[in-house]
């Protein structure tokens, strides 16, 4: 199942409530403010802080 980019209009980072960007190659939603990457599993974003991975600097 593919991620529906229309979801980007309504989802937000659960930590800072900021915008998320879609990384198609890694299948992640990225919060640049918090430097976190949220996984997308089977087209469903997992927006849980404890599942996020820190972005490499």
UniProtKB/Swiss-Prot annotation:
Signal sequence interval, chain numbering: none
InterPro entries: Trm112-like
Pfam families the UniProt entry points to: Trm112p (PF03966)
Gene Ontology CC annotations of this record: cytosol
Family of the protein in this entry: Belongs to the UPF0434 family.
Official protein name in the record: UPF0434 protein Spea_1772
Organism: Shewanella pealeana (strain ATCC 700345 / ANG-SQ1)
């Amino acid at each position: 199942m593919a991620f529906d980019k229309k979801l980007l209009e309504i989802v937000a980072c659960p930590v800072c409530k900021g915008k998320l960007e879609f990384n198609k190659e890694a299948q992640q939603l990225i919060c640049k403010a918090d430097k976190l990457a949220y996984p997308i599993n089977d087209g469903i974003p997992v927006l849980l802080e404890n599942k996020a991975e820190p972005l490499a600097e």
